[in-house]
Structures are given as C-alpha cells and as structure tokens.
Design a protein with these regions (language model features):
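Conserved catalytic cores of very large enzyme subunits
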Residues: 1-193
C-alpha cells in the first residue's frame, strides 16, 4: 500500500486511511505542532469505505483498519518547552475527528463510518483522537444512543457539538453557508471551516 501511494491516489479504505496517516506524519515532521484536525473523516473517507465494501471488505476489516489509525494517532507525542508544558502538560495533542452533523442540503450526514468510529472509541478508549459528534434535530436516534453508550464508558468522548447553534454562529461571523455547514473541530473544542 505504501509503495502504491507514493505514485498513485488511494482507491480503497485501507489506502485512504494510510494516505491520511502519511499526511499527519508529514505535518508533525514539518511543524511539530499540536491540534492538527483530521476533520470530518466519516465524510471524506466514506467513498473509499463504500468502494472497499463492494470489493469484499468486512465490518471486522474496516474496524481493524480504523483501530490501527487510532493507535497511530496515539504514537505522536508533542515535545513542549518548559514554559508551555506548565500550561499544556499531558498526553493529548488535539487530533479531533468530527462525525455526523449535516450535509450542505441540511440532511443527515451520518453514515456507517460514524458508527464505526464510535465503536473503535468504545473498544480502545484511547485519548486520541478527540472524537466529536455533530448533532442537529434530524440526527438519528440510533446515533445519539450509540454516542451515549460510548460517553457512558468514561473516556469523555464523543464531545457533542450542536449544528443548530454552531452553523448560524459561524454564518453570523461572515462564513459562507457551504463552509459553515462543513465545520470541524480543531484541538479540544475550537471550530474550523
């Protein structure tokens, strides 16, 4: 997979996850900075997931690939100087994955990956990535219940963000609707478009 990605775009879920990981390794090598956000991974990885499912990838395969990515996120440890370590000590460095929310047309954006990411969090209970769930009035009850069960495990995730408050607030600050509706979270709770 790594050899292929050196010269060709990803086609499968496994390849797309590996390409995503390469991006974050490069960012860390170049910037040694915290709070790089993978964003709405359940949206941009979904076409690769669907393609792979039609080619025989099982739920178990997809979960294992996702869990491997979650483990990789926990391998990066940010080196801080003594001044910033007093204020920002601790392991997490703010890789925030946003799931759910809505599409540009206002319909529900959750998909199989939204649930898969919740399951990976429930099984691993790792501090990274920060997993955030975007909700709104049309979020499926099943998704809310799945998230509630994961929250009940005590990892503090997923964090909950209300699209019905966030999107209008971003638009009130001059962010175009198509950008506001695709917001993600950086670090702990900071919004980005």
């Amino acid at each position: 997979i790594c050899r292929k990605l050196a010269s060709a775009p990803a086609e499968t879920y496994h390849e797309a996850v590996q390409a995503t990981w390469f991006l974050y390794v490069i960012l860390q090598m170049e910037g040694n900075a915290s709070s790089f956000s993978p964003g709405r991974m359940d949206q941009y990885l979904y076409p690769y997931y669907r393609f792979s499912r039609t080619r025989g990838m099982t739920d178990s395969d997809a979960l294992e690939i996702t869990q491997c990515l979650w483990l990789k996120f926990n391998e990066i440890v940010y080196l801080r100087n003594s001044g910033s370590a007093r204020y920002f000590a601790g392991f997490p460095i703010g890789f925030n994955v946003a799931i759910g929310g809505q599409k540009d047309d206002g319909s529900d954006a959750s998909n199989e990956l939204s649930y898969l990411f919740l399951r990976a969090q429930a099984l691993l209970l790792l501090p990274q990535p920060n997993l955030s769930l975007r909700i709104f009035r049309d979020s499926p009850q099943e998704l809310l219940e799945a998230a509630s069960r994961v929250i009940g495990l005590g990892s503090g995730m997923p964090q909950i963000f209300n699209d019905e408050a966030v999107i209008p607030a971003l638009e009130a600050h001059g962010i175009h609707h198509e950008d506001a509706v695709n917001y993600a979270i950086v670090g702990c709770v900071e919004l980005t478009t």
